[in-house]
């Protein structure tokens, strides 16, 4: 006769005993959902790490000192995915754990080994980026190939020392039947819990924040110098253009005045000469009526000459108006140049700082930043350092935030659960879905590392795109020519392609 269970208990199918609802194992649906999500995370992590590792191995020039650390990070992630994750997926099935407690202890130690190796490598990368930016001249002598390999070996030695205490009795691991996974009994050894949390989160996070804070300050100062130099060069160019436009305007004005004076003198001289010639010809005509006729001819000739003179003056006036118009346009352009000089349009690039592999690359791109015309002249003409545009600070802060926040997101909940287990019974107080989410986030770091430390780097990103194109996009076979006997003809100049050989379409259609 099976025991009857109350509302606060439920019968366990395996042991046929009544268990509190707070200690019941996860349901089959819960286990399936956990396993499916884990498989998706592990698949993406495996693909991302393999592609990035292939790119680094394919291009030897990319395997510099820093990229060796990144390659070591990929190795730790791949080992975590290949050796640890399959057992975590299998234990997500309720009432299924085929091995004994000793294997569970070994599995927890192996999980911590790869996790500590990954954390130590991230710390080394942060220090390496600090030395690269702050001490660029002495960096090659400080970070030699020999020292880089010593650091790589040191990450694994330190990880081994940090993860193996449960194997020789300091700290205990067991299989959690309620949450269906192997875990440490953190409350049984508070000292090991404190050491693990400090090694996992406190020290690495402190080193990362310190290094990237100094790197951000140095990058901001260098960008300010670049920004100031660009603004000074732009002001000099604007002043030169204004002076040049003023000189051209004065030159055109002088030419216009000289041309008007010359045209006025030339028109008056021609009128006097032609009038005197008409007076000399008039006495040769008969006296009396002939004189009258000559007088009329004189008036007529004078009228004609006056008409010509007025036409020339009119033409000269029209040319003068054109010159005046050009001069006014040049003056307006010069005034615009003065306004631009006061406004000082400076461009500061959005991609000035690029933290690929936590590295800073300064480009010469610029994004418009306008000093308002309503600002006081003392500010517009000030020689002090111009303020950095907010887009630059947001860009740098955003990238550093991605690096640090992803680290805290993946390992922070796991460390918080370890600390909480010292004072609280997590088997009964922490919901099972919270434990599942913490497991997902712990393995999510294997997906994040290839993106943060690989894809964000410009050169590595380009190589990854080329590799993906070769894997995904198949090359289409070349289209064979349907008229193999046709020859190329020289295109004439009328076609606008002089000197190039192009297939003749007319030869294909002609009989």
UniProtKB/Swiss-Prot annotation:
It comes from the Eukaryota. It is a multi-pass membrane protein. Keywords: Cell membrane, Disulfide bond, G-protein coupled receptor, Glycoprotein, Membrane, Receptor, Transducer, Transmembrane, Transmembrane helix. Pfam families: 7tm_1. Residues 376-385 have a biased composition (Polar residues). It is found in: Cell membrane. GO terms for cellular component: plasma membrane; receptor complex. The keyword Transmembrane helix applies. Residues 240-315, 367-386, 476-511 are annotated as: Disordered. The keyword Transmembrane applies. Signal peptide: none annotated. Residues 240-261, 477-490 have a biased composition (Basic and acidic residues). Belongs to the G-protein coupled receptor 1 family. This is Probable G-protein coupled receptor 101. It comes from Mus musculus (Mouse).
